[in-house]
């Protein structure tokens, strides 16, 4: 029960509440492991279907508590959805506010670390006397380019276009040569599309999250992204703290015998491994084109394909 997890007032306690895609969950897990190694008590919130995988990556440490949230529509991670329905998951996340508030009141943590989608969490945390921390799973250079208030400085009330995104926002570090090609800018336009009952864009959610939290944390260091971190700090007028790079521990799993034998049949570094992560789903056309391109190399290859769990596979 959550009441059994409440800690003594003198023990630093944080709650982790990432978005429900594993690309977001993983950095929160790595930060949890790092904080726990320094004596911080950690409680992790997620959907029930995600918990086995989360537990397996929390250094197998039972002292890190993982609590499941109930989702009204039964959809609990992006692997269960095709990309165009990801907004449904964000809406489902919005419906957990009462659960989250009850848990925070019972657990009484000092801080709650949250993700871009939970724009409502800073206000909720403030109501119960808890500081909120926006933990960005992205690089500072990308957040500084896309999700800062000055991004709309030159738009003057009209809708933003991909042409606007091809150039950096006003005040962006001058020594940077970063810009987006047209196809890259088009990919980011989804951030400015309204969806859900709240009719908010992804950009508005991120901006509210960053603007209302107590402080911001990035998984980087000054030596790598210093000018962009300074720019973000200036834009949001609040402290930006750094965790340093967060990477998982090297795997100790033994390779399956069938793959070990297959790989042993080729010279070292001669096999191509092609994988786009656990939550990228290619169309039939993309799969055929990709496989054809790999075959044209004349090299042996392993192509890893993923499909949403609720779709028929052919």
UniProtKB/Swiss-Prot annotation:
Q: What is this protein called?
A: Inactive UDP-glycosyltransferase 79A6
Task: Give the miscellaneous note.
Answer: Flavonol glycosides (FGs) having rhamnose at the 6''-position of glucose or galactose that is bound to the 3-position of kaempferol are present in cv. Koganejiro, whereas FGs of cv. Kitakomachi are devoid of rhamnose.
PANTHER family this protein is in?
A: GLYCOSYLTRANSFERASE (PTHR48049), UDP-GLYCOSYLTRANSFERASE 79A6 (PTHR48049:SF84)
Q: What does this protein do?
A: Has no flavonol 3-O-glucoside (1->6) rhamnosyltransferase activity in vitro.
Q: Which domain of life is it from?
A: Eukaryota
Q: Which InterPro entries match?
A: UDP-glycosyltransf_plant
Tissue specificity, per the record, is: Expressed in young leaves, flowers, pods and pod shells. Barely detected in seeds, roots and root nodules.
Q: Which Gene3D superfamilies match?
A: Glycogen Phosphorylase B
Which terms in the Gene Ontology molecular function aspect does this entry carry?
A: UDP-glucosyltransferase activity
**Gene this chain is encoded by:** FG2
């Amino acid at each position: 029960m959550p009441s059994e997890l409440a800690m003594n007032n003198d023990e630093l306690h944080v709650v982790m509440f990432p978005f429900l895609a594993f690309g977001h969950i993983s950095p929160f897990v790595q930060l949890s492991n790092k904080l726990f190694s320094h004596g911080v008590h950690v409680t992790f919130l997620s959907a029930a279907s995600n918990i086995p995988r989360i537990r397996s990556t929390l250094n197998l440490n039972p002292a890190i508590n993982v609590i499941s949230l109930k989702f009204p529509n039964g959809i609990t991670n992006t692997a269960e959805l095709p990309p165009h329905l990801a907004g449904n998951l964000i809406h489902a996340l919005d419906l957990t506010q009462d659960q989250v508030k009850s848990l925070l009141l019972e657990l009484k943590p000092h801080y709650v670390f949250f993700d871009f989608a939970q724009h409502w969490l800073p206000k909720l945390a403030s109501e119960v006397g808890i500081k909120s921390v926006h933990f960005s799973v992205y690089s500072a250079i990308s957040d500084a380019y896309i999700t800062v208030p000055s991004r709309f400085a030159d738009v003057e009330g009209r809708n933003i276009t991909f042409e606007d995104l091809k150039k950096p926002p006003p005040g962006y570090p001058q020594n940077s040569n970063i810009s987006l090609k047209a196809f890259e800018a088009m990919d980011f336009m989804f951030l400015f599309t309204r969806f859900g009952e709240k009719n908010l864009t992804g950009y508005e959610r991120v901006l509210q999250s960053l603007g209302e939290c107590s402080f911001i944390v990035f998984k980087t260091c000054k030596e790598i992204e210093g000018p962009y971190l300074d720019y973000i700090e200036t834009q949001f007028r609040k402290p930006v703290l750094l965790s340093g790079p967060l990477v998982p521990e090297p795997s100790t799993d033994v390779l399956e015998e069938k793959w070990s034998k297959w790989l042993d049949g080729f010279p070292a570094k001669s096999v191509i491994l092609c994988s786009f992560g656990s939550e990228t789903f290619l169309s039939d056309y993309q799969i055929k084109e990709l496989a054809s391109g790999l075959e044209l190399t004349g090299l042996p290859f392993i192509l890893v394909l993923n499909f949403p769990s609720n779709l028929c596979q052919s």
